[in-house]
Amino acid sequence: MPVLAFPGPAAPSPPSVTVEVPDGWDALPAGSDLLRARGTGAAGEPVEVTVRSHTGPVGYAATDLVDALADGVTHPGTEVEPSFVVEIGGREWVARNISWDESSGPVVEVHLAAVVDGPADEAAADEVSRLVVATGRVRGATLDADYDVLQSVLETLVVGGAQ
């Protein structure tokens, strides 16, 4: 009978991740995420960042992940911008902005995904694709100014391991 294990070939340990946040931001309990932080925007609305690990089938790329995340947003009037590539911390990230309106005002969410090298064991590396996804969210009347702060936070992402 097969034995499943964590960490193991189909469930590798998540990579180390760091992100720098402005003074006054709170580190929140991460739950199933790797990191979670929240700050207060210019008009008092929350500015949020989460980082989590994602394991997919072999060949699952960062573009596949941001496409799936965009497909999962079902708010009425959702606008999905084309994905784009950005380099952060020496690593290539695929990013996509998604926006919609809520009763409290506009919301913009940005998803950034990057492939993380697999485990040192070559056989295990052939079983899964390892990725990291960072999600940032801003909302409200000062969305543009808050997005600039969010972007400056996301630009500090560092993922451990080789690229």
Model-derived features with residue positions:
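Secretory pathway targeting signatures of secreted, lumenal, and periplasmic proteins
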Residues: 2-71, 103-105
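Short glycine-aromatic motifs
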Residues: 25-27, 78, 93, 157
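Generic structural detector for well-ordered beta-strands
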Residues: 20, 26, 87, 114, ...
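Surface-exposed amphipathic alpha-helical segments
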Residues: 25, 131-163
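Short, flexible beta-strand-to-coil junctions
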Residues: 54-56, 99-102, 116-117, 135-141
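Short beta-strand element of the conserved SAM-dependent methyltransferase core
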Residues: 37, 51, 96-98, 113-115, ...
